[in-house]
A protein has these predicted regions:
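HAD-like aspartate-dependent phosphatase fold
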Residues: 1-301
Length: 301
């Protein structure tokens, strides 16, 4: 840790620990209604979200409607289709390796379940797969499993962006967010140790303000040297041309910046310290802005 100059945190599922299943059910029920609005059968409402059936580390085979649990040798230990377990013989027939070829699970129709947000996707996709296999719904007969997965993913994602989830959380944060008494002392200790502490979240300012006010209090921004909301990760880490906007904390007003050219003194800028003195809350940007404002040269610092 002695070589680390800056420490960053995400907000959702990091500083803000969401309560399951209450939080997940908001996304699940909201996505169900969106799918029904797209033409999916109303019987989709008969399925309930059950977090105990899903976990991170699974792989979704969107082409076949299957869910896989593999070991470190990429051997499929368990597989299920929709909510039903696939027999051992059939599982080996589909996913077993040959004498010189092992499955890579890197093709586009395989999706890694590596975030808690995706557990809702699993449950909802399994429900649509089950309904399609019943062959009782003409709308689903015209859909492939891959198309259904894309619909599920788009519906859940829209719930996170259009207010279906976050408006409800903002109305009653105690119902959906757990507090951690160790969080504030931890952040303060990092600053006392001379580390720069930053918040980098995909959530927008209004929601971030509500959640952090609940977790920490109205002075929560004092715990951070830099705050970036609406970061659009993972694109934030890839696209160097994303614009950086400064946020006026009191009003939420956005002002465009000249990016790294305004920050770096060697590029004719005013320097990170002077730049942040004008306001340390931003929206968007990319990793180059982050490094420039923190005064670090690489992610390793």
């Amino acid at each position: 840790m002695s070589t680390i100059k800056a420490i960053g945190f995400d907000m959702d599922y990091t500083l803000a620990e969401y309560k399951s299943p209450a939080f997940d059910e908001l996304a699940y029920k909201g996505a169900v209604e969106k799918l029904i609005g797209m033409g999916y059968p109303e019987e989709l409402r008969n399925f309930e979200y059950d977090s105990s059936k899903w976990c991170r580390g699974l792989i979704i085979d969107t082409q076949r409607g299957n869910f896989l649990k593999i070991d470190r040798h990429k051997y499929v230990r368990i597989a299920q289709h929709g909510f039903g377990v696939i027999s051992s013989d059939y599982r080996k027939q589909i996913y077993s390796r040959t004498f010189n070829i092992s499955p890579s699970f890197s093709e586009k129709h395989y999706v890694n379940v590596d975030t808690l947000f995706q557990l809702v996707d699993c449950s909802l996709f399994a429900a649509t797969v089950t309904m399609k296999d019943e062959e009782e719904f003409a709308f689903l007969d015209g859909k492939t499993y891959e198309e259904m997965y894309r619909d599920v993913r788009a519906s859940v994602d829209l719930c996170h962006r259009d207010g279906v989830i976050k408006d409800e959380v903002a109305r009653n944060p105690a119902k959906y967010i757990s507090k951690d008494d160790k969080m504030i002392p931890m952040l303060k200790q990092f600053k006392e140790d001379g580390k720069k502490v930053f918040l980098l979240t995909n959530s927008l300012w209004e929601y971030t303000l509500t959640v952090m006010n609940y977790l920490v209090g109205d002075d929560w921004t004092d715990l951070f040297d830099l705050i970036i909301v609406g970061s659009c990760k993972p694109v934030f880490l890839i696209d160097r041309f994303l614009n950086l906007f400064r946020i006026e904390e009191a009003t939420g007003k956005l002002t465009n910046t000249d990016g790294v050219y305004e920050i770096l003194e060697e590029k004719g800028g005013i320097g990170a310290e002077t730049f942040l003195a004008k306001g340390k809350v931003f929206q968007g940007g990319n990793w180059l802005h982050l490094q420039a404002m923190l005064g670090i040269n690489a992610g390793e610092e």
